[in-house]
Amino acid sequence: AEQTNKTIAVAVTDLETGQEININPDEAFHPASTIKVHVMLEVFHQAEQGLFALEDCLPIANSFTSIADGSKFSLEQSEDAEQTLYPRMGEEESIAELTRLMIVRSSNLATNILLEKVGAKHVQDFIHSLGIPGVRLVRGVEDAAAFRRGMNNSATARGLTQTMELIAEKKVVSEQASEKMIEILLGQEFKESIPALLPKSVKVAHKTGWTGDVYHDTGIVYPDGRRPYALSIMTRGFSEAQPDEAHARMAEISKFIYDKLQ
């Protein structure tokens, strides 16, 4: 096989024992869609503060403001894993449903609509207040003007795992909000990585991310009869043309961790 430089980072925290397993945990990656978890955190945070209710509706629109220069931009529908919102321009959808679509189908459109509502800076401030290291959200999806200026999101496996750990321990916003977030993450439709080789009875609340040669999966794994563990796998350097290779490698790592912790 051709030698490409592949970087893999893994961070595990076992909530049963407190044990950690870390490989390159502080390596910075383009987070791709894993950062949508942090948008969800701030949505629940602002709902808790009474700034809006999750049942409130927002207009579905495909026009967004660049954080770099205030210019307008739109998302490429063909690049979005979630297609059902695009034919509905001008209609409204609830914040709750937009949040669900952002997570379970990785809707870029829902992400940017929600980010315009809550504000990227507020998401970053909340990440900071939770003490989550190595995670930076500065812009929404496909903000080309910001990208050209080097204004990019970033994350580490340690940061993603700490995020999942806080959600699993129901310490984010409130116990009820954390439970709702877990429920959303359990509905994840992209299951090629962390859950792929685990026993069917094992629930996984997780969020995948993919862009270019970057493939990630971060989540909470619930083995039978014990407390869960938080796991993040981040990769760079797998072929864009062969996503199956990245997914297979991540699935193997997930299975290895699962077996090791049993």
Feature map (PLM): residue ranges:
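Solvent-exposed, acidic/flexible segments
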Residues: A28-V37, L51, R88-A96, I103-N108, ...
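Mid-domain, small-residue-enriched loop/turn segments at the edges of structured enzyme/sensor domains
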Residues: T7, E91-I95, T99, R105-M164, ...
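Acidic helix-start/capping segments at beta-turn-to-alpha-helix junctions
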Residues: L15, L54-S78, K117-G119
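Beta-lactamase-like hydrolase cores
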Residues: A1-E27
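Conserved catalytic neighborhood of penicillin-recognizing serine enzymes
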Residues: T65-N112
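Active-site SXXK
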Residues: G18, H30-S63, M102, L231
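Sec/Tat-exported extracytoplasmic proteins
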Residues: A1-T4, L41-L51, N62-F64, A68, ...
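Structured C-terminal helix/loop/strand segments within mature extracytoplasmic catalytic/sensor domains
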Residues: K117-G119, Q162-E192, V202, T208-Q262
